[in-house]
Amino acid sequence: MHHRRFLFWYYTILSRYICRLIDANGRGCWYKAMRWKCTVAYDGTEFCGWQSQVNHNAVQDVIEARLFAIFKHFVRIHGSGRTDAGVHARGQVFHFDAEWKHAPEALLRALNRNLPPAVRITRVEAVDDTFHARFSAHQKRYHYYFQLRPADPFEARYVWSVPYPKLDISLLEAAVWCFEGTHDFRGFAGKVLPCENTVKTLTSAGIFKENNRFVLSLTGSGYLYRMVRKIMGALVMVGVGKIDICFIERRLRLENLQYPLMTAPACGLFLEEVLY
């Protein structure tokens, strides 16, 4: 009985990762499952985040459901990291292992077929099996979009209309440089797990104008929960005179942690790019 059970599981696993191909000359060759790297853009407004949830209302759930329809068995995807409910992405990256004997372009078309309009795979490529969407990433770039005027109905999902019309952008531009470098960012996180490493490095931090709105751009090797939104909220507090640059510098030294910071809403946050 145990021998049969072992053979059953052995051939089940084997069939999942190895398939039979016939080449142009009619000769057979063995084909191992390949690792596929995918880039995806999504509007996170209606999703409860990236990571799979019990109610299946996460971006990961939608993509895995599409993969099940293609391969007729469950395929787990591994993302570069999580995004929270309401957060968007232009360049989220994930990978999965599956047998696919056609061109990557055909897989791209198959993935996008019947996906909801809010999710679109923008690139598919075969990669070495040592690649990992999360652990191979060197840095991630986030953009936070905000403006000083009310948003019209066609942009309200993707930008924060800051409720302070007299916000001094020059103060934000002066304060944002405080965040560059290696710091303990626990004072700029929503919540921190007991054993979590709160020391992170931001290689660039800046604010620039794009048409009629402004963009906070952060590039770094790692982020804490709600870290970008907390930084954005702190900058707005500087811009309206509630705190000053010295306050941010002291908080990065883990002083005045008892003082609550504003958390910017999720709608303006985009995962722009994952760098490998």
Where are these regions (language model features)?
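Short terminal hydrophobic/aromatic SLiMs and anchors at protein ends
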Residues: 3, 11-14, 24
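Short linear motifs in intrinsically disordered
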Residues: 9-10, 18
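Structured-RNA-binding interfaces characteristic of tRNA pseudouridine synthases
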Residues: 17, 28-276
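Intrinsically disordered, low-complexity cationic segments
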Residues: 1-2, 30
